[in-house]
Every structure is written in C-alpha cells, then in structure tokens.
C-alpha cells in the first residue's frame, strides 16, 4: 500500500551490517530522519525480524543439502518445478514487509522497499510529505 497522493519528501537507506561477517543483516540504528514518524522500538523490531528471516534463509540444514544433491543429480532442472528453501523465505520476507507497510509504515507516510529490490544492499524507506502536519522544516 503506497500513499499515492503525497509527494516524496526523501528517502532513508538502512545499510548492511558487516560486523558479523558477510551474512545478510542490516543495521538497527534508528535514523534521525524517522524521528516523529515512527516509534524507535517498532523500527528496531522490523529490522530485527528482517535480520532473523535472512538468517533463516541462509541457514544450512538437511533441506539445503538435499536441494543441492537433487540439483546435481538433475542438472539443476529440479528448480524448474521446486522452490528452494531460500526462495520460500524470501517470499516470507516480502509478505512481512507488505504487512508492515499496511499496518505501520504507510499510515505514517512511509514505505519500506523490499531489500531484494536493492540487491540486498540496503533497506530503503521512502518518506512522503506530511499531510496537514508541520514537519518542522
């Protein structure tokens, strides 16, 4: 759900956090641009949930090994008729972001963009101009 009528006033980019290596996780530091727009705890919870989902996607387990073996045995044609564990979790991420946008972010004039659309490099948050509320600028 996107606030269609309001013009874009800016964008905030939440960068990847490489402090624990190259696994996909994002910084939970609250950006100053979102002050008075969304609750700090709600923002941090959203990013933590996304980080947990990406950790689940990258987790190696029996299913991942089985997928790899089946891929080798079928010259990777198995993936034409089967979703990988990673793809299933990415769908969960997309659904979670859509729910967060509808329930929390869009009513506040914000829009989360799925990190997969930005190559898993950043979480983009679009800020729409306040509708009838002074932004203090």
From Swiss-Prot:
<feature type="lipid moiety-binding region" description="S-palmitoyl cysteine">
    <location>
        <position position="72"/>
    </location>
</feature>
<keyword id="KW-0449">Lipoprotein</keyword>
<dbReference type="InterPro" id="IPR051371">
    <property type="entry name" value="Ras_palmitoyltransferase"/>
</dbReference>
<dbReference type="InterPro" id="IPR019383">
    <property type="entry name" value="Golgin_A_7/ERF4"/>
</dbReference>
<dbReference type="GO" id="GO:0005795">
    <property type="term" value="C:Golgi stack"/>
</dbReference>
<dbReference type="GO" id="GO:0006893">
    <property type="term" value="P:Golgi to plasma membrane transport"/>
</dbReference>
<dbReference type="GO" id="GO:0002178">
    <property type="term" value="C:palmitoyltransferase complex"/>
</dbReference>
<feature type="lipid moiety-binding region" description="S-palmitoyl cysteine">
    <location>
        <position position="69"/>
    </location>
</feature>
<dbReference type="GO" id="GO:0018230">
    <property type="term" value="P:peptidyl-L-cysteine S-palmitoylation"/>
</dbReference>
<keyword id="KW-0472">Membrane</keyword>
<comment type="similarity">
    <text>Belongs to the ERF4 family.</text>
</comment>
<dbReference type="GO" id="GO:0043001">
    <property type="term" value="P:Golgi to plasma membrane protein transport"/>
</dbReference>
<keyword id="KW-0333">Golgi apparatus</keyword>
<dbReference type="GO" id="GO:0050821">
    <property type="term" value="P:protein stabilization"/>
</dbReference>
<comment type="subunit">
    <text>Interacts with GOLGA3. Interacts with ZDHHC9.</text>
</comment>
<comment type="function">
    <text>May be involved in protein transport from Golgi to cell surface. The ZDHHC9-GOLGA7 complex is a palmitoyltransferase specific for HRAS and NRAS.</text>
</comment>
<dbReference type="GO" id="GO:0000139">
    <property type="term" value="C:Golgi membrane"/>
</dbReference>
<dbReference type="Pfam" id="PF10256">
    <property type="entry name" value="Erf4"/>
</dbReference>
<keyword id="KW-0564">Palmitate</keyword>
<protein>
    <recommendedName>
        <fullName>Golgin subfamily A member 7</fullName>
    </recommendedName>
</protein>
